[in-house]
């Protein structure tokens, strides 16, 4: 079995654009990135890793994705199904997920603008 000690992920912090980072593929490092215990969510052939306690700790809203709000920082990793491991995202996945996140961020901005206009 190939060891994926370092993996390339797409990190999304609240109020920031997503960025590509290389992380050590350890539980401790993942917990440090999301500031707590991790929750793993399957998403379009990859995984979203976020803080399991994000809602109970009332972390800062980050992104609305698939009918749920992700709170706090999260990152996306590839799925090595055969070896039950996380792997680097490939270039296609990075491009696709970055586009998806940026489009959702734009929708959220437009919704906020619409609400402000209605209140005036």
Report the location of each language-model feature.
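N-terminal nucleophile
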Residues: 2-15, 19-112
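Non-Sec secretion/translocation targeting segments of pathogen effectors
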Residues: 111-120
């Amino acid at each position: 079995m190939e060891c994926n000690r370092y993996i390339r992920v797409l990190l999304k912090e609240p109020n920031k654009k997503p960025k590509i980072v290389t992380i050590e593929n350890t539980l401790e490092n993942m917990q440090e990135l999301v500031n707590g215990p991790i929750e793993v969510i399957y998403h379009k052939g990859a995984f979203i890793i976020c803080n399991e306690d994000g809602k109970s700790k009332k972390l800062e809203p980050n992104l609305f994705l698939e009918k749920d709000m992700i709170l706090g920082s999260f990152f996306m990793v590839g799925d090595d199904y055969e070896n039950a491991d996380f792997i680097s995202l490939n270039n296609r996945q990075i491009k696709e997920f970055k586009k998806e996140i940026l489009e959702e961020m734009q929708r959220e901005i437009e919704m906020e603008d619409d609400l402000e206009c209605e209140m005036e």
